[in-house]
Design a protein with these regions (language model features):
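Long, charged/polar, soluble alpha-helical segments
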Residues: 21-184
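Sec-dependent signal peptide recognition
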Residues: 2-10
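Hydrophobic h-region of N-terminal signal peptides that target proteins for export
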Residues: 11-20
């Protein structure tokens, strides 16, 4: 009896962890291919992540505006915000990766440009997410749908703030480190 209970618990635990570990990839196959092509170029990689992240916000606006998508709209917005947040995390990971890596003079220059573009993009993203939150709080229909995505919206706003702060901090470090340009 005890062995059967232990086996049942073990199976339940294995099934639960396998489902918990499955997250859908926010990138399409084509987007993943584009990223692979520029894997060693910090600037192009950051530009692509910004483009893909912006596309999630554009899709979110389309879902909100399309009356045909009214059914399940809150869940669709939730999923797009989740994808957006995952992509913002990828931007953070790339910032960390390239900040800690010795870069050639040209790559460091490109990284600086990428940092500036991340800051500008984060300001845009922040404004768009703030607008979504305002609509979700003030529009009666959207308020009902917002129950499905308000928590994820807050996560997205936190992620944007984190990315913007990180890019600003790294930009200051890169500007103050002239020796980094002389290393290669």
């Amino acid at each position: 009896m005890k062995a059967a209970t232990k086996i049942s618990l073990l199976l339940l635990l294995l099934v639960a962890t396998s489902f918990a570990g499955r997250r859908r990839d926010p990138l399409t196959e084509a987007e993943a291919d584009q990223l692979r092509e520029v894997a060693m170029d910090p600037y192009k990689r950051l530009k692509l992540y910004i483009k893909f992240t912006e596309a999630r916000l554009d899709s979110l606006d389309l879902v909100r505006a399309d009356p045909k998508q009214a059914e399940g709209r809150g869940k669709k917005i939730h999923d797009l915000l989740e994808d957006f947040t995952t992509l913002m995390d990828e931007i953070n990971d790339n910032l960390d990766q390239y900040q800690g890596r010795p870069l050639s003079k040209d790559d460091r220059k490109d990284f600086r440009r990428g940092l500036k573009e991340v800051v500008v993009a984060c300001d845009r993203f922040e404004a768009r997410l703030r607008a979504l939150k305002n609509v979700a709080q003030n529009d009666p229909q959207m308020r009902r749908e917002a129950q499905d995505f308000m928590f994820v919206l807050q996560d997205a706003q936190d992620g944007v703030k984190s990315s913007g702060d990180m890019a600003r901090e790294y930009a200051e470090v890169v500007e103050k480190d002239p020796a980094a340009d002389k290393k290669k």
